[in-house]
Amino acid sequence: MELFWLEHKKLWRKRIVNICVLLCFVYIVIFGSVLSFQWFSFGSSDDYTSAFGNNFDGYGMIRESQEYGKTFGEDLTDESLQQLVREYQQMEAAGMEKELEKTDWKIINSWLGMLYPELHDPGTYQTMISYVNPDKLTGVYERREQALDDFLENSGQAGKEKEYLLNMEQKVEKPLRYEWVEGWSQLLGSMVADLGVVMALFLAIALSSLFAGEWHDNTSSLVLTTKNGWKKIALTKVLTGFAFTIEFFAILAIPNILSQVFFMGTTGWDLPIQNIKLIAVAPMNMLQAEIYEYAFALFGAIGFAGVVMFISATVKSNVLALLFSLAAVYGPMMVAEYLPYGIQKALDLLPLVGSSADIFRTNTFHILGSYIWSPYLLITIPVMIGIFCTPFTVKNWSRRLKA
C-alpha cells in the first residue's frame, strides 16, 4: 500500500497531469455544463448584441420552460400534441418571441416530421410546427408504431432481430408522459454523451508517460535495484493509473451532476427517453439513461487507461506513447465511416470509440445465434479490454527493462 501511495503522489505531482485535469474540468464543467445551462444553450436570445446571441439568464428560462411544459398535462395524447402545436402557432402569430423560447418546438418539430411526413411542405422555409394543421395530428401511437416498423425495415432489421427489438419496445409504458424535454435532450445528447471522448485526450496525455517516462527521466535502472522488484512496481503503476482514472472521472462527474441539479432540479427524471427520440425502443427513463451514459464514460475510461498503459509499457518514447494512445481512440472514429457496417460496429466496442447515444438506437450484435442490444456490450467490453491489457503491460515492461 505504501508503494501505491508513493506512485499515486508521483503521478499527481506531475505538472502536465495537473494541467490536464484543470483544462478538462474547465472545458467539461465550466463551459460544457455551467455556462451551457446559464448562457450558451438556454439563455434567452432576444438580445442579439450579447455573445452567442444569448443572455445570461438560463436558470430563469429553464424554470419558466419547465412550468410551461406542465400546463399540457402528464400524458402525450393526440389532444395534448394538438394543443402544443396550436399554442406555438398562436404565440408565433402574435410575435411572442420570448414565449416561443419556452416551448419544446425543436423536439415537437422532430415528432411531426417523423409521424406526419405527408404534411411536410417542401416549398416553404418554415418548420412544420409553424404551418401544420393541428386538427390533422391524430393517431400518435399508431403512427409511432408504423414509423418504428418502417425504420427497422429500411435498416434491414427483419426476422428475429426485428422481433427482439419490438419485444423490448413493448416494455415501454404508454401513453408516454410529457413535460419540458429540451433540457434532458441537451444533457443526454451532448453534455454527458461527450464526456468520454473529451476525457480520452487528457487521459492519453496524463498516462502515456506512466511507464515510458521511466526512460525519459533516466530512472529505469533504479527499478531493477529496488527492493520491491519490477513486477510489484509494474502492478502498482497499473493500479495507480486505474485509480487516477476513477478520480479524474469523479472530479468531472460530481460537479457536472451538481450543476445539473442546480439548474434543472429533478423535474423530468422519470420521463421516458422516447420524448427525445420517438422510435427509441429502450424502456428507460431519463435518469436511467443518464446513469448509463456516466457508466459508459467511466468504464470506457478505465478500459482506455488500460490500453494507454499497455502502450506506455511497450514503447520507450513519451511522444510515441502519446501518439499511439491518441490513435487508439481517435483513429477508429476517423476511419469508421469508410468501412463496412459490420466493422464499424466492431470498432465501437473499443474503449471510448463507441457512443453512449446508442441507447436511443436500434443497433444490435448477433453473437452465437442470439441478438444482443449494442449498449449492453458497449458498457462491458471496453472495460474488459483494459483489464485484459494489464498482464501484458507488466510483461512488456519487464522485457524492456531486461533488454
Describe each model-derived feature in a short phrase:
Residues V26-Q83, N133-E214, L235-T314, N318, ...:
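Secretory targeting signals
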Residues V17-C20, G300-V308, N363-A403:
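Alpha-helical transmembrane segments of multi-pass membrane transporters/translocases
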Residues V21-F25, V319-P332, L350-P351:
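Central hydrophobic cores of alpha-helical transmembrane segments
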Residues M1-N18:
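Aromatic- and glycine-rich beta-strand/loop motifs that create alpha-glucan
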Residues L207-L222, T226, W230:
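Transmembrane helix boundary and interhelical loop/hinge segments in multi-pass membrane proteins
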Residues I16, G229-W230, S317-L322:
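Membrane-helix interface segments
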Residues Q344-T364:
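Short hydrophobic, aromatic-rich alpha-helical segments embedded in or entering the lipid bilayer
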